[in-house]
Amino acid sequence: MITIRKAEFVTSAVNIKGYPELTGPEIALAGRSNVGKSSLINKFINRRNLARTGNTPGKTQMLNFYRINDQWSFVDLPGYGYAKVSKEIKANWGKMMEEYFSRRENLRAVIQVVDIRHVPSVEDQEMHAFLRNRGIPVLVVATKADKISKGQWGKHLSQIAKALHIPDWHIIITYSAETGLGVPELHEAVEEILSMDNEDS
């Protein structure tokens, strides 16, 4: 487990002009609106309300930067897949993502958060393919596992792997921000990402 000595919100940004100048590796979180990215961050760092959670899908249309241990960063990306917003907002979201993924040099990996209860949406599939095509490492976390019985996990994880074309050897972390399920595994995966950065330096 990673020891979280310090965690703080840095800033929100809508384009590269607002990106903070942070050293060290950066890990982004992507997922549909209300899939639980903020809850995942809060549980990971063991802080209840550092990352703001919301009940309105599509409300947070900014990149939120969080600094961990003064060494590396989480970036909570705006949620996708919301239906009740204008085409202009959707277009702005696409532009925001393209700029971030192409210009953020210290991005090391993306944690893609999906809801274990549902087959990944078209938007989930498009995001996963987009990241893979760019050569960005993707770690899939299937959250809200407490909402279904343990006996159903295997079937649902298989559906997720099939929809996202994830090979059998690639790990999908079963996760619940409510119970803490999967937190040690996520810590281990993040630690591995960070250690790879240390090896390169």
UniProtKB/Swiss-Prot annotation:
Mg(2+) binds at S38, T60. It comes from the Bacteria. Necessary for normal cell division and for the maintenance of normal septation. GTP binds at residues 31-38, 58-62, 76-79, 143-146, 175-177. Belongs to the TRAFAC class TrmE-Era-EngA-EngB-Septin-like GTPase superfamily. EngB GTPase family. Keywords: Cell cycle, Cell division, GTP-binding, Magnesium, Metal-binding, Nucleotide-binding, Septation. Its cofactor is Mg(2+). GO terms for biological process: division septum assembly. This is Probable GTP-binding protein EngB. Residues 23-196 form the EngB-type G domain. The keyword Cell division applies. One of its GO terms (molecular function) is GTP binding. InterPro entries: G_ENGB_dom, GTP-bd, GTP-bd_ribosome_bio_YsxC, P-loop_NTPase. One of its GO terms (cellular component) is cytosol. Gene3D superfamilies: P-loop containing nucleotide triphosphate hydrolases (3.40.50.300).
